[in-house]
Design a protein with these regions (language model features):
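A long, amphipathic alpha-helix that forms part
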Residues: 60, 405-408, 446-492, 531, ...
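Extracellular glycan-modifying ectodomains
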Residues: 89, 390, 427, 498, ...
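A short beta-strand-to-alpha-helix junction
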Residues: 335-342, 459-471, 514-527, 538-565, ...
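Transmembrane and membrane-interface helices of multi-pass
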Residues: 1-219
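Active-site-proximal alpha/beta segments of enzymes that process anionic O-linked groups
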Residues: 187-449, 526, 557-588
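Short glycine/proline-rich turn/loop motifs
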Residues: 325, 387-389, 450-461, 540-547
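Polar, surface-exposed loop/tail segments
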Residues: 502, 545-552, 556-558, 570-604
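Histidine-centered active-site microenvironments of extracellular/periplasmic hydrolases
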Residues: 288-292, 491-541, 578, 583
């Protein structure tokens, strides 16, 4: 008898919460299936069924330890939270193409009561039940029917109640006979599921215990990162990410309040910064690449108006980290963190420049990955945005040429002194989507002799990347032409490099390994960088033009870019440091260029 009781012990949490166990498992499965993207190759989380089982069982175990009265209250609270979160999650997926994420939560926090009312009236219509929301509502309806089973039973006729009781008693007798075996099976599955889920649970714990949004993003680049596979986990992760972002926002606002401009000579009336995306200089024909991917930039260089810099690296190979380091007056190696220092557009605005930010990525959107959230949260914060920018575009575009239309709409606001920042989508994956099909000029056959070791699929991918680079060349050239008759200086740099079957490395995009070797640094951190000076600018500022040309072979890491920009504007401020300004006579060219704040780029050597 004691052995039987011991063997059936694993069944107690389920017996005491049978409705909870069954319907929460169904709810988890329905949510996973309802939020599976309708794209080729999309798959469910590989450990879904086992991890859902052990999570469900663990919740039942906790509930079973509560006194009966508290157990009922606990289940009611859990049902309310889990169903509400599930409905919100699948609704967001059906309406916006994304499950709950940090950006959605941030948008909710910035929504006032009027906007919330308009949203509810516009989007909460009966039609939503036809989508994924309807699946969750069906589970909820079945659960309600289950909860009302005793009331329904009492409404049956006496004969039907007796027949039902007989069947129930026979079923219970059969179940009692197999309880020991069922207990063993449940215990075995729980152990199996716990072991199989341990890695993901550890990964999720690392995400939830990260100390900054940047750390969260970096953890997500690891192959074994935690998967928040349930709506309630995604909600918790979104709340945590927003808490971390809010902490850095407070620091940035504090730094902004202390920012000061002592004087400004307005040396360069119009300064343009073009920030590209995922462009390593080894795919630029301007830097020696065999395929003609940058003919227009090369032509500008031959004209003498464009000065190409030869030794420039990015501080990170992640867009969000690059943006934080590029926008902050902080440089890697200085005391404190990036968010402890002012952002350079704030200083330009204080100095009297009209600052415009035109981006094809960092606008507040519901369907936004953590990477965009991490890079854009400080740019989209209402307080910081108002302190940095006078004008911004309101929409993103499929292709970067849409930004030129945005500029034309905002141009009249510029005034006599302007800083305009273009942020392109550039060569961001997926490469084939970065350029119109009609602009395809580079074909797979191009690589028959250049890269014969690549298979057909790889050569297609490479052609797409190089076509995206060629299209990017046309966009950059068109931006430069907007300023050819102005007293303007234009700086171009991508955020970081990109790999596309480089050498024998055999992969695309970037490798986010903590260890940085020579090849990784070469392909993912070395970037093109140049400065264009218009004919009018060259006539009016010969000394500064000469400085720009004289600095072209100096070492540079782009975290120091703001100090050069302040030099171009003639802004004097406590946060400006000449030793970080590549145009200054006091520039410290031997400052360690620490990639990811850890690896000295200039000490890396090729593998033998």
């Amino acid at each position: 008898m004691k052995i039987r009781k011991l063997l059936t012990l694993p069944l107690i949490p389920i017996y005491r919460n049978v409705g909870f166990f069954v319907f929460m498992y169904i709810l988890g499965a329905v949510c996973a299936l309802s939020t599976l993207p309708d794209t080729r190759g999309a798959t469910l989380y590989e450990n879904l069924w086992l991890e859902l089982f052990v999570d469900d069982y663990a919740a039942c175990l906790v509930l079973s330890l509560l006194p009966r009265r508290l157990r009922g209250i606990g289940r009611a609270v859990a049902y309310t939270v889990l169903y509400a979160t599930a409905l919100a999650d699948v609704y967001c997926f059906g309406k916006f193409g994304s499950t709950l994420n940090p950006s959605m939560l941030m948008l909710v926090g910035e929504t006032d009561s009027r906007e919330a009312g308009e949203f509810l009236r516009s989007y909460l219509t009966p039609e939503v039940l036809r989508g994924p929301v309807g699946n969750v509502v069906c589970v909820l309806a079945l659960h309600v029917a289950w909860s009302l089973r005793r009331r329904i039973f009492r409404k049956l006729s006496y004969r039907r109640r007796m027949l039902a009781l007989g069947r129930i008693q026979r079923l219970r007798a059969r179940m009692a006979a197999v309880e020991p075996v069922a207990g063993i099976i449940v215990a075995a599955v729980v152990v199996w599921a716990a072991v199989a889920s341990a890695g993901n649970k550890a990964g999720c714990h690392r995400l939830m215990s990260a100390s900054s949004v940047g750390e969260v993003e970096h953890l997500l680049t690891a192959k074994d990162h935690g998967v928040m596979y349930m709506p309630i986990y995604r909600l918790a992760f979104s709340i945590r990410s927003n808490q971390l972002a809010a902490r850095q926002i407070e620091q940035l606002i504090g730094a902004s309040t202390k920012a000061r401009v002592d004087s400004c000579s307005y040396t360069s009336p119009h300064i343009v910064l073009i920030i590209g995306e995922s462009f390593g200089r080894h795919h630029s024909s301007q830097y020696g690449y065999a395929v003609k991917t940058t003919p227009r930039q090369s032509a500008l260089e031959r004209s003498g108006l464009l000065t190409k810099y030869t030794d420039v690296v990015s501080p990170w190979n992640l867009t969000s980290f690059c943006f934080k380091n590029i926008f902050s007056m902080h440089v890697i190696g200085q005391e404190g963190d990036w968010c402890d220092y002012p952002l350079f557009p704030e200083l330009f605005r204080q100095a009297g420049y009209h600052v415009t930010f035109i981006t094809n990525q960092f606008l507040p959107r519901a369907k936004e990955a953590v990477y965009d959230f991490s890079g854009g949260f400080f740019l989209n914060n209402p307080i910081l945005s108002s302190r940095m920018f006078d004008s911004r575009n309101a929409t993103v575009h499929r292709y970067d040429d849409g930004l030129l239309d945005d500029y034309r709409q905002l141009k009249d606001q510029e005034g006599a002194r302007s800083l305009t920042i273009f942020h392109l989508l550039g060569q961001h994956v997926a490469y084939k989507q970065r350029y119109p099909a009609a602009r395809k000029k580079i074909w797979v056959s191009t690589y028959d002799t250049l890269r014969p070791e690549l298979d057909l699929r790889e050569r297609r991918m490479l052609a797409d990347y190089d076509n995206a680079t060629l299209y990017n060349d046309s966009i950059v050239d068109r931006i430069v032409r907007l300023y050819k008759d102005s007293d303007a200086v234009v700086i171009y740099m991508p955020d970081h490099g990109e790999e596309c079957y480089e050498g024998t490395r055999g992969f695309i995009c970037r490798n986010h390994s903590a260890a940085i070797d020579y090849d990784l640094a070469r392909y993912e951190f070395e970037i093109p960088f140049w400065i264009y000076t218009s004919p009018k600018y060259r006539r009016r500022h010969p000394e500064l033009t000469a400085r720009i040309r004289a600095a072209r072979n100096r070492r540079l890491m782009t975290d120091a870019l703001p100090h050069m920009l302040l030099h171009l504007a003639g802004i004097s401020a406590p946060d400006y440091h000449a030793e970080y300004d590549i145009l200054s006579d006091s520039y410290d060219e031997m400052r360690p260029r620490l990639l990811k704040a850890t690896t000295d780029y200039d000490k890396l050597k090729p593998a033998k």
